Amino acid sequence: MMKTEKSIEETLQEEFFREKAVVLCRATEKLEISLRRLTILGDHITEFHFAEKEINSGCNVINTDLKQLNEEIDAFNKVREEVKLCYYYLIVTREALGLRRHHWIEECYQIPPKREKYEQNL
């Protein structure tokens, strides 16, 4: 005899697994979005830095440009802290759902180091 209807337990278990997947997806997506923002800011800082070096060719960078570059670095470091928090939330979420191995998370979602501000001479 073939069973056609699911039991209440089976239905609840399926719903529970779907909810787990949604929660993990949401936490991972937040981390990925924050990392993307961080990458864009990092690339912008690097481009700005090299453009200024090329334009000034060894001369001192104008203070307003240096101020702008340091503001970009502040923004980068702020987003980096957000990334660290999202990473932490993902790990905590995984732990709460019974997932204990996180080595692939560490490999996939590497957080770049904090950037230091520049002084007068680049």
Regions found by a protein language model. Name each.
Residues M1-F16:
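Short, charge-rich amphipathic alpha-helices with coiled-coil/heptad character
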Residues I8, S34, I62-D65, T93:
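Terminal low-complexity, poorly structured segments
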Residues L12-R36:
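Short, charge/polar-rich alpha-helical segments
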Residues E15, E19-V23, E71-E82:
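Conserved aromatic-histidine-acidic binding/catalytic patches
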Residues L31, I40-H44, T93:
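Intrinsic-disorder/low-complexity detector
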Residues R36, I40-D43, E47, Y88, ...:
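Generic surface-pattern signal
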Residues L41-F76:
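Mixed-charge, low-complexity intrinsically disordered segments
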Residues C59, I73-L122:
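Amphipathic alpha-helical packing elements
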